[in-house]
């Protein structure tokens, strides 16, 4: 046979994939850095949040849960004392365990972070390296883009940031 000649003969030959979308946003407050994808971006802000406010990991968690119809981050990790100041990496690990229990694994992520300042281009490689370490994904399966909102709205006024993540899970 030829490996490039892919054929579908039985149901098991089909890849079982699920796709989910996630979103998160937080206001800024005075601080010593923004947690973005498990990497602390140095600046004069931090996220005003119940946990570490890592908008990338929180949106990733939402996308993974959504792909399997398991609710959202607030369903599993509500704003209670138990989850106060939780790190996004820890919440991701718990979510990943849920996904694995359902027979799925994270296969690919595509991320868009929207903020005016700080510019993330300088930190892009560090953020991707952090995400690679946390998720176990190859760099080629991590899409990361940083955008501005062209000075419009709360993001444009540098009052906060937002993130969208699409995740693909495979069985």
Description of each model-found segment:
Residues 1-20:
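Conserved alpha/beta core of the MobA/IspD/sugar-nucleotide pyrophosphorylase nucleotidyltransferase superfamily
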Residues 23-40, 132-141:
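Acidic-glycine-rich active-site phosphate/pyrophosphate-binding loop
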Residues 41-51, 79-83, 151-155:
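A short glycine/serine-rich beta->alpha loop
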Residues 53-64:
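Short alpha-helix carrying the canonical HExxH Zn2+-binding catalytic motif
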Residues 63-105:
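Glycine- and Gly-Pro-enriched alpha-helical subdomains that act as flexible
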Residues 110-119, 123-156:
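Short, conserved loop-to-beta-strand elements that form functional interface hotspots
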Residues 155-171:
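C-terminal edge-of-domain segments
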């Amino acid at each position: 046979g030829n490996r490039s000649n892919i054929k579908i003969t039985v149901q098991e030959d089909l890849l079982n994939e699920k796709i989910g979308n996630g979103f998160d946003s937080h206001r800024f407050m005075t601080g010593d850095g923004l947690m973005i994808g498990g990497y602390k971006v140095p600046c004069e802000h931090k996220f005003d949040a119940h946990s570490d406010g890592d908008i990338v990991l929180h949106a990733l968690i939402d996308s993974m849960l959504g792909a399997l119809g398991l609710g959202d981050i607030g369903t599993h990790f509500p704003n209670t004392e138990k989850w106060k100041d939780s790190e996004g990496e820890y919440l991701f690990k718990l979510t990943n365990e849920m996904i694995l229990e359902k027979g799925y694994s994270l296969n690919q992520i595509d991320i868009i972070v929207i903020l005016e300042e700080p510019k993330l281009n300088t930190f892009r490689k560090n953020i991707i390296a952090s995400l690679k370490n946390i998720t176990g994904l190859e760099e080629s399966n991590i899409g990361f883009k940083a955008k501005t909102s062209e000075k419009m709205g709360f993001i444009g006024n540098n009052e906060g940031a937002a993130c969208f993540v699409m995740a693909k899970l495979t069985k």
